[in-house]
């Protein structure tokens, strides 16, 4: 079962000037971590990628993590699921079908993430898919992706995150 695992994914949002912004999976890790280890992993990933936002599911250990990381000054946002995992995954499939999701071929974790996505929801694990659907829904609902042309074009530069990492990953990437 996947309940024993915690997963962390890091995303970059980038535009090419020809359409709505795309997303690149910049990092993924999962494990069975006790709370102090989970907290340190979250801080380490923040230091590694310097994201503008950290999204944490507000249940189980996530509640304590939200409080601790906010007190540490990190840019925390809560995610409260309002539907089941399969429904959330279904809600983001158009982003994959439209070729808007990138992932680097050269990273060890890419194969693991892709295998989990391929076998979801009947596979052995769903931890990455849970973080992926939460992140993509949050970015779409928050206006970071799926803008109308008039909205996103004049704000494109403000919405590009982790530009250097995204460009490096994009040069060695494939469409999901």
Model-derived segments and spans:
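RNase H-like, metal-dependent nuclease domains and their acidic two-metal-ion catalytic environment used
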Residues: 1-79, 103-176
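Short secondary-structure boundary/hinge segments and terminal tails
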Residues: 64, 86-87
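Conserved helicase motor
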Residues: 80-86
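Residue-level detector of intrinsically disordered/flexible regions characterized by low predicted structural confidence
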Residues: 87-90, 172-174
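Short, surface-exposed amphipathic charged segments that create phosphate/polyanion-binding patches used
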Residues: 88-99, 116-119
């Amino acid at each position: 079962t996947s309940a024993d695992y915690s997963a962390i994914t890091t995303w970059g949002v980038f535009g090419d000037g020809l359409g709505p912004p795309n997303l690149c999976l910049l990092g993924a890790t999962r494990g069975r971590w006790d709370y102090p280890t989970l907290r340190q992993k979250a801080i380490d990933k923040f230091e590694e990628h310097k994201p503008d936002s950290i999204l944490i599911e507000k249940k189980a250990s996530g509640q304590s993590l939200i409080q601790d990381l906010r007190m540490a000054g990190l840019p925390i946002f809560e995610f409260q699921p309002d539907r089941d995992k399969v429904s959330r995954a279904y809600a983001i499939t158009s982003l994959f079908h439209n070729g808007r999701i990138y992932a680097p071929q050269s990273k060890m974790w890419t194969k693991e993430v892709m295998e989990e996505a391929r076998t979801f929801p009947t596979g052995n694990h769903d931890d990455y898919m849970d973080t992926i659907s939460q992140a993509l829904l949050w970015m779409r609902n928050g206006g970071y992706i799926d803008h109308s042309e008039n909205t996103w074009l004049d704000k494109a530069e403000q919405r590009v995150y982790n530009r250097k990492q995204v460009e490096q990953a994009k040069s060695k990437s494939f469409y999901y």
